[in-house]
Amino acid sequence: MSSLVSTPFTTATGVQKKLGAPVPLHSFLLSRRQPAAGAGRGRAAAAAIRCAVAGNGLFTQTKPEVRRVVPPEGDASRRGVPRVKVVYVVLEAQYQSSVTAAVRELNADPRRAAGFEVVGYLVEELRDEETYKTFCADLADANVFIGSLIFVEELALKVKDAVEKERDRMDAVLVFPSMPEVMRLNKLGSFSMSQLGQSKSPFFQLFKRKKNSGGFADSMLKLVRTLPKVLKYLPSDKAQDARLYILSLQFWLGGSPDNLQNFLKMIAVSYVPALKGADIKYDDPVLFLDAGIWHPLAPTMYDDVKEYLNWYGTRRDTNDKLKDPNAPVIGLVLQRSHIVTGDDGHYVAVIMELEAKGAKVIPIFAGGLDFSGPTQRYLVDPITGKPFVNAVVSLTGFALVGGPARQDHPKAIAALQKLDVPYIVALPLVFQTTEEWLNSTLGLHPIQVALQVALPELDGGMEPIVFAGRDPRTGKSHALHKRVEQLCTRAIRWAELKRKTKEEKKLAITVFSFPPDKGNVGTAAYLNVFNSIYSVLQDLKKDGYNVEGLPDTAEALIEEVIHDKEAQFNSPNLNVAYRMNVREYQSLTSYASLLEENWGKPPGNLNSDGENLLVYGKQYGNVFIGVQPTFGYEGDPMRLLFSKSASPHHGFAAYYTFVEKIFQADAVLHFGTHGSLEFMPGKQVGMSDACYPDSLIGNIPNIYYYAANNPSEATVAKRRSYANTISYLTPPAENAGLYKGLKQLSELISSYQSLKDTGRGPQIVSSIISTAKQCNLDKDVPLPEEGVELPPNERDLIVGKVYAKIMEIESRLLPCGLHVIGEPPSAIEAVATLVNIASLDRPEDEIYSLPNILAQTVGRNIEDVYRGSDKGILADVELLRQITEASRGAITAFVERTTNNKGQVVDVTNKLSTMLGFGLSEPWVQHLSKTKFIRADREKLRTLFTFLGECLKLIVADNELGSLKLALEGSYVEPGPGGDPIRNPKVLPTGKNIHALDPQAIPTTAALKSAKIVVDRLLERQKVDNGGKYPETIALVLWGTDNIKTYGESLAQVLWMIGVRPVADTFGRVNRVEPVSLEELGRPRIDVVVNCSGVFRDLFINQMNLLDRAVKMVAELDEPEEMNYVRKHAQEQARELGVSLREAATRVFSNASGSYSSNVNLAVENASWTDEKQLQDMYLSRKSFAFDCDAPGAGMREQRKTFELALATADATFQNLDSSEISLTDVSHYFDSDPTKLVQGLRKDGRAPSSYIADTTTANAQVRTLSETVRLDARTKLLNPKWYEGMMKSGYEGVREIEKRLTNTVGWSATSGQVDNWVYEEANATFIEDEAMRKRLMDTNPNSFRKLVQTFLEASGRGYWETSEENLEKLRELYSEVEDKIEGIDR
């Protein structure tokens, strides 16, 4: 059935077509699209299109003139009737039509005592300088100002500045819930809020921060209900003025034309001098229910759900589907203001569409900002406690509890847990018209993303589908046909999961394979995919799901999925589950023809046999395990890699068509971090039906296992593929340990410490120097020639520095092995995680770190110990080792006391209570009593170990399988933050619906403090390496995940480099900055070139705006060039480019909207590049899109020349490592974003920039050179038996992990040239020359082993590895041998 839309769509015919049918416009997402020729448009609509395509780059170009209502021309002046001018500013446009109707009716009354001129502004329009000037001009002769829901700080300050100038002159100023700065403008006779926020203000408590943060609006509503009755009988003018303010709020919240008429009459006759004593009668406010149930066809609003259901059951207009007692029931959450103002057409459309599709609806509304009560009151049966509904869809866009300013997520989560159904939060456009959104590559306005996408996600909200647009002429919301249909179909599909039996449900499990190769099937970050799938399916089988034919082992499962059983000889193909002929593909895939621009006619040559499109995978009963096709770069890699836009290929589209329409999955489970679906081209957030992720996922509920430590990309999956993201644990981190020569070095140092004062001291030092050189440590520690006579203090210093280096290696944290879903770590495996949790001070919780407590015991500060160890002071290195060992021992003793004889943690709470407070019986005290730290502060230890006990429970909890089953059963999955569990243990337990954070909450104060330490160390290190000079420019990278985990540390680093500090508003949101004085800064302002990842751009575009404003502000400061390198370079570049200083100061870059990565990594992984210049051109073409704070709605604009000139001034490149789980060679993203060699080519002097990595993975933050970090990575992972043997335990997938580290090392050679030759030599000795290891690798995963051999040969061929011809000949022979072996396997 076609969509039912209740109100006419008052926009151009061409745009109606675009919204009403599958839109053949994927290409518009990254191109300049013009209006349809001849389409009739009003002036405002045309302006909107011009803005979106080529205008001044603001988000909206609607003008207040469409909201200006004046008395009939000449009429008022002829009759001598006074004119009253009212100016209003609101967040959303729903009041526009109601106010307009009210004013027109007032002015049409022949007996009126006044003529009303009323003009309204949407707060977002005030960004435009011309509109702001008009606003100020309107205020200059206004009698009354009204403001409501003004919560965007920079715009709130503009409103405050303009109104403040006219406040004393105006007759009345009324501001309803807004930021305190604006609320203080209130003035009604003697009533004022000028003291708001001060303790003596009666309204102070309403703004006071409290945990129940939905309370402000609800407190206001209680006042609205009760105060007028009380104040009416108080004689003072103050009381009556306060009463009229509250009545005004009643009228405003009532919102109907009648209420607004009476509101304007009341204010005019009470406060406009020309109307004092006039015969103007007004009625009391018509009060609507604060909360209730509303249906457009119902005779009334209902306050009783049983009454509503009785009416619903007696309706005669329903279709047969609705009469089915088993029909799905959808709860809708609506904004009361839209209903009372009559701006409800978009709500009607959703209700009608759901009912047309056979779903019953219970549409509830509330007038405040707390919907938790109404959801319980109207959606849950009070007798049984069971929900009436199978799914809930919020159409408000806001968090469930709290509006734009503050939220109470725990309260919302508690309410949603009681409902226990899927929770979808759909969006009406607020700050853009429909055409502006359609033409925007960004999609949703960034402030709407922050308020109405990011915040509902913290409640567990998902599927941010834009279902309603806004008419620029009337301001009314209207349904978007295809979007409403998509929303309703998907809501019903989620509801069906609640109703279907387990046996009949069909599940499509999707695994990934990149780079495309049999050895890579089942790629996912730190997850053993096939073992996990096997574990999940066994559990689902026990639960009653049909998994017929599941093999007996995980290994057999791998074989059945990855090998083409029909192939007689060696075949690169996987098992073919379905052959789709071209006619079937085209008939079932509505957008198939759009892919031909990039891929030609179907079937093409990817996932194809030349006649049919091939779907790879294997079906077991009602479960299909499929392999997601790759991006398609392997088909014609260089053409596509250079493309700023792309599209899925026919095979990719066919896969999802098969899953949805042929296999008919009830849900798809994307297994592991991460695939390609969510990164396909389209709007960043708030997609249209012309966006590929939306087209591909279709109507299938999407469940997605995502690594807990990667909330940023999980958020992209949530927003762009409508995923319910369930977190999984990465393997517990362990200390790297020592091996081979490093272990020997440790033993020599131990001997030196006990024998240094004997005659053997010099001899042992000589051995230490010799062994250190054999271990290639001379690259990291300056070592003298062997046999040189050294005085004792110099001997100590050399030994101390070598000791510090091997301690750094030994204590380096690394995840060993791969995680399996449903297998939480054992207690002993959790010890290392607890040790690291215990290593951080947590001042907000008054918890001291264990190293800090132990250092204080011997009269030291742990920071001083770290500094001494870093300098190689032997005594401090030894003390740090003792502290580290004592910490591990104390925590191990504690964990052992909570563990049963099977190694499982049991009943931590009770066992902890029996330990605490009993002095020497506390296991950590018992352990420390055997060390030099026997006098450690017992109370601090007790506080710490109480906290560690709670963490231990979370670490070993297993919710991953349980949450998957909840999602499959159509239940609510509890949300939780993603990130680093060491920094934030609230990430645990895993199995939560992973979310990021409020993007306006960063950087935090703690992040600023950490950032300052790192930047200061970076600049000092660069001065040492650069002849005492500060770097003038630093080129750096901002990652989405890093900034979530660290609450904005790297963002804060940029701000500190240029010398500005963020300023939080009343609600703690960071939306502006101020310069730090040069005196306070104590150094020059460093210029920056900021490369934001595509994911950072999607999640933190408000912070990109903040950064760009900050850089431009600094460039415009009147300061000496030698103290302000931003200004110095911007002036030079302005002259060279012939542009303004402000434009030349562009420094914030990323990909084009909807595009991700430089694709250098993909070229390296596929070995599909010829020379480094090609990689550098690729980087520049993909990453040279600039953000402009002066045109924030324009999206990312290509400014390659500006990007090149800025990079050419870089003296250093810089990146951050923030957690132990992911380092430089673990993923390809780091080298993909590294511009080191590129900068060298752009610099006029041809000098290579210094390259640094900040390591904040431990409490002792370090700044190392890139080459030092690559060496450390190689020693602790690739060359470390503890790491590679841990990987080998994971079998097939472990071999792939080893190969991936070598490939990423080659990537660093390509982009930076910072990999030492010995790294390749040692890797070759470890994996190729060792016959037993070579055989294990080849037998376990021959495809990945072939890639390993190929990578060694490539490293040599490209000049990154100099080795013997004998080694190369061996590798060539091995390549032929493994090719034969692969052919033998497939034969």
From Swiss-Prot:
For this record, the Gene Ontology CC terms, alphabetical, are:
chloroplast membrane; chloroplast stroma
Uppermost EC category: ligase
Q: Which reaction does it catalyse?
A: protoporphyrin IX + Mg(2+) + ATP + H2O = Mg-protoporphyrin IX + ADP + phosphate + 3 H(+)
UniProt KW keywords: ATP-binding, Chlorophyll biosynthesis, Chloroplast, Ligase, Membrane, Nucleotide-binding, Photosynthesis, Plastid, Transit peptide
Membrane topology of this protein:
Peripheral membrane protein
One matching Pfam family is DUF3479
The EC number(s) attached to this protein equal 6.6.1.1
Assembly description: The magnesium chelatase complex is a heterotrimer consisting of subunits CHLI, CHLD and CHLH.
Q: What is the name of this protein?
A: Magnesium-chelatase subunit ChlH, chloroplastic
Source organism:
Oryza sativa subsp. indica (Rice)
Name of the encoding gene:
CHLH
